């Protein structure tokens, strides 16, 4: 069998199995695809593909299904990621551009991506090691109670209510806010702990106790901003594809719930020349994802954070890759350089 025909037969098997979820036989391939050869020839071709470990027979079925190796060869033959339709691109743009802050952007992103792909969508929060302070706001809620708002240049907003330990008026709090903002605007969040003592020391002695409390609050907010987190949506899609996980869907759900597993997997996925990385079945380093595939790409400054989907290995890879790439591009555009 020639290499082009081998790839053509494999492509037809993958497409039919993804569409029907049924093992594929030679007769069906001849009827559905213009392969230009007889059913007997296709049977021989399928036997050769099976010998190479690219397809296999589930149980006693007469048909064949792709193996992880077969899916890998199929994905590797996708020379370029196809663009989404104009309607799909417009829907992405409309939904994401209505977002108000980073949390809202990422929540909308995973909901949209799970709808486009019918898989579980996941997105890492941008790595904030290089994020800087854009704005600080102090809001007086009661004489001793202040709402602290910290906004990073990535759009991330962190806030908490603290007791400043002494009574403050609006004017006094406004003065403290002005001092903190003037001193800290543009400061990397990672350097905030080192910068805060000097700000407190420069405050009037009568307000230093409150300034120390505000500094502790800002430090805590900066620390929570630096924690690695992700957002996901579409876990119900896994339940609908339960039959695609013959062993058990439990380990997949555990991997999603134990966010550190997914965060590590996403972080370790190298960028593919096509812009989208695919990890199939047992290529995943976590045993619980041996029956799953992950399609992801980077977004934002340096493309260091990832957005992607997780689903069964029986996945529409071309469509999924296109959706992931398109959403990542819009996400990067919204978040800016």
Curated annotation (Swiss-Prot):
One of its GO terms (molecular function) is DNA binding. Keywords: Repressor, Stress response, Transcription, Transcription regulation. One of its GO terms (biological process) is negative regulation of DNA-templated transcription. The keyword Nucleotide-binding does not apply. InterPro entries: DeoR_HTH (IPR001034), GAF-like_dom_sf (IPR029016), HrcA (IPR002571), HrcA_C (IPR021153), WH-like_DNA-bd_sf (IPR036388), WH_DNA-bd_sf (IPR036390), WHTH_transcript_rep_HrcA_IDD (IPR023120). The keyword Repressor applies. Negative regulator of class I heat shock genes (grpE-dnaK-dnaJ and groELS operons). Prevents heat-shock induction of these operons. Belongs to the HrcA family. This is Heat-inducible transcription repressor HrcA. It comes from Arthrobacter sp. (strain FB24). The lineage of its organism: Bacteria, Bacillati, Actinomycetota, Actinomycetes, Micrococcales. The gene is hrcA.
